[in-house]
Every structure is written in C-alpha cells, then in structure tokens.
Amino acid sequence: FIHDSLYPSEKEDISKAASFIHHFDQLLYQVNTLNESNVIIFTNNVEESVKHLRAFKLSIIERHLTSEMKIHLTPTFINHMVNELEEYLLILSYLKQGKTPPIFHELHHHLIWLVDASGHAGAINDRLDGVEKRLKEKSSTFTKHFEQFYLKAVELAGYLRTNIHKFPALK
C-alpha cells in the first residue's frame, strides 16, 4: 500500500518502501527452508525487520501529521498498519523463544481487526465509481457495521476488567 500511495516526489521513501518489499519477499522465500535448527534465528531476523518497518511507518505518520510529506493514505490508515505490525511483534516474541503464542481473548482480536476492516471497507467505498450506487451502499453499510462492532468491542473489553471473561453479550 505505502509504495504505491506515495507521491512521486517522495523519492527517498519510495526507495525505502521498495527495499522493504524486496527484503520481505526474500524472507518469504526463506520460509520453505525452515527447520528446527534455523527457525529461531529466522524469527529473530524477521523481528528485527518488522521493527524497522514499524519505525518507517511511524516516520511516515509523523511527517504526514506535520505536513512534511505527501501520501495518498491517511495517518489513521497507516496507524492501523502499525497496529498490525505490533500484533505480529507480540506473536514473534513467543515464537523466538520457541513457544506457542497464547490464545488471546477474542476481544483482543476484535479491537485490532474491526477497525482495520472498517478502514478497508471505507477505502473500497471511496474507490468505487459514483455510478456503482448499490455497491457503494453495501460498502458504506459494511463500514458502519464494522465501526459499530468496534465500538461494542471497546465496551465489552472494558467489562473484562471484572475478571469475567464469558458473558451473554459475547455470544
């Protein structure tokens, strides 16, 4: 998303984004060669790469907020990308120790992915031609539903502070 959304004048960031694409493609290629003897080293390398990508995206948000760069993505959309990277770093923190990540409460995932889904539904709506009235209505409805589900998840996650992890509203 970032590479194709940067203004052509953002040459340095375009180059960095292309470098990240190439680097992560290389990591993906290495997945087929993983075994018990190299998986931890690989995971540590991935973690380091993800941290660099996170820093790059945060620098874009910072410069976007201060009007020092031009990109066709909102700071909020990029922030959602950072949230995804942080979730991946959480998973990697277990994998690099040879541990299986725990199963987090479903609301943990709702708080990450519902806001992301809403952003994607909104982006789809924004890219649809105005003559696609039915599709735009459906997309707008999806956006609203995801936003409503997210707000509900925020409140339900607050209920978890009672140490009750299952209650009727979660069904």
Where are these regions (language model features)?
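Surface-exposed peri-terminal alpha-helical interaction modules
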Residues: 1-171
